[in-house]
Amino acid sequence: TYPDPASRDPHAVRTVLNLSELDIRAGEILGIRGHNGSGKSTLLRIIALLEPPDNGTLLFEGRPAGTEDLHLRRQVTLLLQTPYLLSRSVASNVAYGLRVRGISSASELQNRIAASLLAVGLDPAVFLHRRRHELSGGECQRVALAARLALRPRVLLMDEPTASVDQQSAERIARAARHAADSGSAVVVVSHDHEWITPLSDRLVTLREGKLVE
């Protein structure tokens, strides 16, 4: 629930998400569609352990999970609609999260960076040393996705990943999502692009006013 700006009562709240149960499975792509304000992004933030639900429990492999569980939060990664990249090389951007997680071996960093770039359709020989200003919008999104794939997350969340990219990048992002699922990650994709998300998803649900309608 959030404060309701449409109400004159300063204490009034609006329920933006009201789910009884939703399973997310390893090795599967769960597609979530819905109009703006339907609760899609709120759901992703709860799954990403960025904010707690007001009621109910989020379970990870049968155990309660909370925002204070830093170990679990490192196993979940979120790709936003508008990617944020450092003003550095592509290699540095992909390596950043790996270094934060304590991976310092030069060979492992090199292998993970190369593999994740290939997974999103970017040739390391061409893109490794390019900087943010040398990339198109679609390439920036693919680099941001590569940085998350390099972490080998248990859960990969994607919030409108193709909203501002070209057709080629949208296709590459779909392939990368499938690769992540085939590698064992649970993948959750939010999109209002029905033509893109429908063939991609193993399961497809619709949110309407915070509730699952199908």
State what each model feature region is.
Residues 131-135, 139:
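Conserved ABC ATPase signature
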Residues 156-159:
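Catalytic Walker B motif of ABC-type/P-loop ATPase nucleotide-binding domains
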